[in-house]
Amino acid sequence: MFINNFDPVAIQIFSLELRWYSLSYIVGILLGWFFAKKIFINNESIRSKFDDYISYLIIGIIIGCRIGYVFFYNLNYYINNLIDIFKIWQGGMSFHGGLLGVIIASILFAKKNDQNFFNYLDIVSITAPIGIFFGRIANFINSELYGIETKVPWAVKFTSIDDLYRHPTQLYEAFFEGFVLFIILIYFWKRGFMKAPGLISGLFLIFYSSFRFFIEFLRVPDEQLGYMIFNLTMGQIISVVFLLFGSYLIVTKYENKKKN
């Protein structure tokens, strides 16, 4: 068993703080950017515009993550405290919201440049697990998104929360949604799935949503929401929606791949 008493602040210079969570965003975006340009982009037209696309992507991620959290997880509070929506430093980001932000940013950028937005979304999908991995590690350091009580040998006590030993669900997600998902997508990328725009995106949605859905059974639900319809969490409900959308993409895009 392990005791988690990590400091969420990575670096502090006088009153300026750089937190692990912020650092995870920076590292995830930079590494994703690097691998995308060095390995996964084969189209020169997309490569030449990718740096500009990153600006859209960053804005989409930040706004999407925040608005997603506000809308999906704590709408009643923010309706009565509108100014707090802008206080991102107080916490409250949603991956599913960020995913919607990325999709919208990709559509807007591709439309501006008269390109298929799936060409960009597939690249983001195959590199996203890198950012997810570091993001979940940061969640672990921050003692947030923790699991239910357990007696497994690898249980963790989050001292800033209580004295219970819990499932380190952040590490489960880092492993499955980060490392394992990256390996799966690389497997399909090597088999030419990137040649059919939308297939890699569909696979990402299916596998991410599946991993997230099952790990959520071990995770403490959001305090302000608890369990919802069919005793599922909000994260599980949204994951089902994205799973269905990913399945739709696979069916339609794979048919197009066979025709071509």
Question: For the regions a protein language model found, what residue spans apply to each?
Answer:
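A feature for loop-to-transmembrane-helix boundaries and adjacent hydrophobic helices
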Residues: 1-260
